[in-house]
Amino acid sequence: MKTHNFVSVRLFGGLGNQIFQYMAGKSLAVDRECDLHVDSSWLQDGYTHEKSTISEFRFFQPDHKYERKHRNLLHLYFDRLATVASRNSAFLARLLGIHAPKSAGFEDLSELEIGTQLRGYYQSPRYFMKLADSGVISEASFELLEPSQEFDSLATQLRRSGYIAIHVRGGDYLHNKAGYIQMTTKYYLDALSLLGSKYSDLPKWVFTDDENHARNLLASIPNLNFIEVKIITAAETLILMSRADAIVCANSTFSYWAALISGKTSSIVAPRSWMEKTNRPEDFFPIGWQII
């Protein structure tokens, strides 16, 4: 007889992915009126980016956290095997108590049993919007718990004149076998053109994990400034980006969340295509964003 009174979610990947996963888990826990347990063992094992942790945000309030690393490679292997088995067999998914969807987007979680662990991407704004509509969470919930002095200094500097935030992903995006589409110089030129004269005189600040790549990609765009992201955390970088007057997103969940919590619409530009073989669902982009 099952006595669980919780659902759980496994976090992995960069900060944008972690936020999507947490929102899916929180939405399910609220629906079921049960506790939310968060499994960050994969983050402890290094399945994330440097300085990328969701726990810096005020909204991150799980009822229980499981933060231990896997005991050894064999333990990690069997854990991976359980995920794959659950993804391919509904029977094993119920037996193991794992929800491992084949798609990266929205999943109807209403039929899941209490005690199930979510192991997927859940890249849909629906979970966040549902929580926001019910008052459980809001854009203000993304307040940083302990902002650093470096963050405060940058925030003050940027606030003086206003700014456009331009996000460029490099690093793993240039070599990842998952098939990310590479953003082109034309995309960024078109995006800035779409924003129009209203923002043309604002300083342009580039947020990137690969400055050399970004400088080469944006060489034809004059008067760029580059945020020194190594001195602040991923959460702090996301908040700085969200406070911009206009945002040019990359095909990244990181700048997606910065734009989503900014409260802006027409001053957000994002690429329509993210992956080579899959498309974003129609409801992925909020109404009013400029999608090109």
Model-derived regions: residue spans:
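Short beta-strand segments
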Residues: 38-40, 165-168, 203-208
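A short beta-strand-loop structural module common to alpha/beta enzyme folds
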Residues: 34-45
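A short, glycine/small-residue-rich beta-strand->loop->alpha-helix junction that serves as a flexible
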Residues: 11-20
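Leloir-type glycosyltransferase catalytic cores
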Residues: 64, 277-292
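Short amphipathic alpha-helix
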Residues: 21-28
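Extreme N-terminal starter segment of soluble prokaryotic enzymes
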Residues: 2-8
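Donor-binding and catalytic core of enzymes assembling or modifying cell-surface/extracellular glycoconjugates
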Residues: 15, 194-270, 275-278, 284
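Secretory-pathway luminal glycosyltransferase catalytic domains
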Residues: 5, 49-199
